[in-house]
Amino acid sequence: MTHQTHAYHMVNPSPWPLTGALSALLMTSGLTMWFHFNSMILLMLGLTTNMLTMYQWWRDIIRESTFQGHHTPVVQKGLRYGMILFIISEVLFFTGFFWAFYHSSLAPTPELGGCWPPTGIHPLDPLEVPLLNTSVLLASGVSITWAHHSLMEGHRNHMLQALFITIALGVYFTLLQASEYYEAPFTISDGVYGSTFFVATGFHGLHVIIGTTFLIVCFFRQLKFHFTSSHHFGFEAAAWYWHFVDVVWLFLYVSIYWWGS
């Protein structure tokens, strides 16, 4: 490594942003192909390239931070600001879905029967699976906070147990959501109700899967002693993201499931 007189991390040229962007293009194109032509080839190719990109990009970041010592306090501060800005951009992303929902539901057009839910739509009972999902995510918020405090206090085994519980709850939430979609009495093509419901809850479900993946990486890193009580931004970022996913679900539950039904 060449000598440098500053604390910043000059990242080496990396192919992963490009392969990540191309895999995202393949996935979105593949999703369209699946919807319209019932072909999953492009979607599977996109998912495979996305998984490979994620694995290698995470591997490089772990090498730079844990083994090469590039993540100085100054670099960590920059990463913190970056994560905060990313979460703010995600808030604005979901604001669009809530806007679409309230725009349609607060002043239903005559085509919808002048009422909400629209005529012919039988909404899901908010006191059944959605309420269970809410309690599952709230419990996972408690367990990840337990994991964070255990890590800061140096209780390695407690941290692993709490993180495992959080991951298990995240997987359970995803399975419950999938079963709810499978049994729902309406589809994404059932007018504005179906499209706003499935797009908003579907993107939230995607974020839960991303957050769970993030936590699984942290779990394996903790098994390999990568985190210390004072140097663990990878886990901290995952925890922030998970709390964001929690809060979005509370808004979805109150707006779409409870008030919207």
From Swiss-Prot:
Which Gene3D superfamilies does its entry note?
1.10.287.70, Cytochrome c oxidase, subunit III, four-helix bundle (1.20.120.80)
Q: Which GO terms describe its biological process?
A: mitochondrial electron transport, cytochrome c to oxygen; respiratory chain complex IV assembly
- Keywords annotated in UniProt: Membrane, Mitochondrion, Mitochondrion inner membrane, Translocase, Transmembrane, Transmembrane helix
Give an example GO molecular function. Answer: cytochrome-c oxidase activity
Reactions accelerated catalytically: 4 Fe(II)-[cytochrome c] + O2 + 8 H(+)(in) = 4 Fe(III)-[cytochrome c] + 2 H2O + 4 H(+)(out)
Does the record carry Cytoplasm as a key word?
no
Cell compartments where the protein resides: Mitochondrion inner membrane
Transmembrane: present as a keyword of the record?
yes
- CDD domains given for it? Cyt_c_Oxidase_III (cd01665)
List, alphabetically, the SUPFAM superfamilies matched: Cytochrome c oxidase subunit III-like
Q: Mitochondrial intermembrane side of the membrane: what ranges?
A: 35-40, 106-128, 184-190, 257-261
Per the record, what ranges lie on the membrane's Mitochondrial matrix side?
A: 1-15, 67-72, 153-155, 224-232
EC number(s) in its UniProt entry?
Answer: 7.1.1.9
Membrane topology (UniProt)? Multi-pass membrane protein
A single Gene Ontology CC term = mitochondrial inner membrane
Q: What does this protein do?
A: Component of the cytochrome c oxidase, the last enzyme in the mitochondrial electron transport chain which drives oxidative phosphorylation. The respiratory chain contains 3 multisubunit complexes succinate dehydrogenase (complex II, CII), ubiquinol-cytochrome c oxidoreductase (cytochrome b-c1 complex, complex III, CIII) and cytochrome c oxidase (complex IV, CIV), that cooperate to transfer electrons derived from NADH and succinate to molecular oxygen, creating an electrochemical gradient over the inner membrane that drives transmembrane transport and the ATP synthase.
| Similarity-based family | Belongs to the cytochrome c oxidase subunit 3 family.
Subunit details = Component of the cytochrome c oxidase (complex IV, CIV), a multisubunit enzyme composed of 14 subunits. The complex is composed of a catalytic core of 3 subunits MT-CO1, MT-CO2 and MT-CO3, encoded in the mitochondrial DNA, and 11 supernumerary subunits COX4I, COX5A, COX5B, COX6A, COX6B, COX6C, COX7A, COX7B, COX7C, COX8 and NDUFA4, which are encoded in the nuclear genome.
The protein in question is named Cytochrome c oxidase subunit 3
Originating species: Tragelaphus spekii (Sitatunga)
This chain is encoded by the gene named: MT-CO3
